[in-house]
Amino acid sequence: MAYKNFKFDVDADGIALVTWDIPDRSMNVFDEISTQEIGEIIKQTTSDPAIKGVVITSAKEAFCAGADLSMLEGMNRSYAQLFKEKGEEAANQMLFEQSRQMSQSFRAIETSGKPWVAAINGLALGGGFEITLACHYRVAAENPKTRLGLPEIKVGLFPGAGGTQRVPRLVQPADAMQLLLKGEAVNLTRAKALNLIHAVVPAADLIKAAKDWIKGGGKAVAPWDEKGFKLPGGPVFSKMGMQMFPAGNAIYRRETYDNYPAARAIMSCVYEGLQLPIDAALRVESRYFTKVLRSKEAAAMIRSLFLSMQELNKGARRPAGVPPTKVKKLAVIGAGFMGASVGYVSAQAGIDVVLVDRDLESADKGKGHAKTVVDGLIAKGRMKQDAADAILARISATSDYNVISDCDLVIEAVFEDRKVKADTYAKAQPLLKPGAIFASNTSTLPINSLAEEFKDQGKFIGIHFFSPVEKMMLVEIILGKNTGDVALATALDYVRAIGKTPIVVNDSRGFFANRCVMRYISEGNEMLLEGVPPAMIENTAKMAGMPVGPLSLQDEVALDLGLKITKATEADLGPNAIDQAQKKLMVEMVEKQGRFGRKNGKGFYDYPEKGKGQKSLWPGLANLQPKQLDPDTLSVEELKQRFLVVQAVEAARTVEDRVITDVREADVGSILGFGFAPFTGGALSYIDFMGTKNFVALCHSFEKKYGSRFTPPKLLEEMAAKGETFYGRFPPKKQAA
């Protein structure tokens, strides 16, 4: 029988080799065809007495990247349609049956009576890893890049094809929960130590090793189907179980604040499933998976963190008609922390980099940052010396501007001062080669005003990185009014080449991300001045889904920098453009108290010397509050909502102002750029899933109590009146360049 996505061969020993190779895709995924065909292959191999065993592998570099989440979106659409036609019970049953097809197929592998071997030749994630767990033997090809894992939690789901039941039956409970709840992939050494795979062999011997295991009498029985099987950590109701599950629940609550239905479902699946035989446990898993799949959190996270991000990473915003560009050599002018970091990630991606600064000592210091980073990675076993040497060899440092004359892209990363930037542009412009693109990494100064110092404004663009550059995945590309398509295409191609996710925004003070995050910071300061206890401010922000509290965030950014930005905004736009009470607070903190944040060991928090305890809120904050409110009189829910609403309403303003022209970018940008509660799907999805009518009503409620910062823009009022959503009114274009 011929298959579309699999090659099927049987050798003289009766061993079937099933090779996964989806046409016209760089990676295998479980789409509808693959799911259907693997079911047919299982039936064929089980029923054919001539077949003695099965080896499943991949013809691609990776084994399988997991389920095609757009297939799950289709299931949800079918659910919604059936719900309308036949009601909730029929729709739930349909979703349950559809969502457990993979789980049933994988169980059929285990119980087929024929030995199955997973010959893992590369990356295996999600459903791609779950099918290997259902095989009776797992052998992997030696490859330091191979990772195995179950990352579904990162898009609001959990492993629904047996992962929550097989992993804790193979692995010690604490390790199993880490794999499931964090969604982090492990290398082969770690996977073997955890008992997730049985063997690692040279790539050339992979298929032979798999077949040899079958020919050597490999048993076609899963461990949990054998009589006398014992869980690695003992029964749930045992001393170890009682130590693990209560502590696990506490850790889960601490990390998620119960905002993620999938995380709660994982805890329940494992706890309930380990008390049952495997078949009943798999049904429990499928029930929970069906429930989570219907949740707004899963729908929002799948849309933003998988579908939208994938589309943006593939170049959804790239202008049509511009040939592909490649930055072979990059100049970074300004080798401070930000510039040095940009240089490092570029060199890591294979781009030759020259760091330019006012003197050689400063430029060399920038290159030294790259050495510090690679030395740290080597010490942690995450980079080989030869790879580190290659990165460092691609970075040169100089004080001579003439070196930029053969660069394809020049990024300015000097101090946030108009005069300093203007001087830099004056030096650089005469040296640029024809066709070179010039970008500013400014984080606050409008691109249009900076472009006035540039003769060919068509080749001038903003490329705003977020700190720390090595970790932050978002890059804002800012268009000036005269920025050309080639400049935009070059910027997008470069950002994609260094493995970051780009969003394209129009010029505005603070662009998109800083406009929204400054609202978050300001709301924290407002609460402080209202008399809300500082600890309550920080904790309710994290309960709302933010990664760090607003006071802690200011310490990380640096309070003196925040004050400089405030003063610059006031100088440019006048005294009404800033909150004078907040300025007074920051003047007190920085100029009178000398508290700059983490960098000098004291800000809103006190920071002990390394290794001498944890940071703690500065007791002196109480003296800066005009009054102090009793926490028992405050609504935790209202404080949480204030943090999210004030950011979301600003995101809506950026759409009205045409700073954001693609709603996907607001959602992806808000999550990757400043950690806006990921379970909401992003700032605009937060509004959409709440309903624009409800959101506007909440805005007006807060507006009456707290002021005009909560006033919804006219666009939102209009959308609420019509019952529109952002994704309905501004449907994204799906094409990618």
Features from the language model and the residues they span:
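Conserved CoA-thioester-binding segment of acyl-CoA-metabolizing enzymes
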Residues: M1-T57
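N-terminal glycine-rich phosphate-binding loop for ADP-containing cofactors
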Residues: K4-F6, D11-D13, D21, L72-Q81, ...
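Structural motif
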Residues: I15-T19, E37, V55-T57, V117-A119, ...
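Amphipathic alpha-helical interaction surfaces in cytosolic regulatory modules
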Residues: I33, S47, K60-R77, F106
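Short, active-site-adjacent cap segments at secondary-structure transitions
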Residues: E61-A65, L125-G126, I404, L445-P446
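Conserved catalytic cysteine-centered active-site region
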Residues: S105-A118
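Gly/Ser-rich catalytic serine loop of serine hydrolases
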Residues: A118-G128
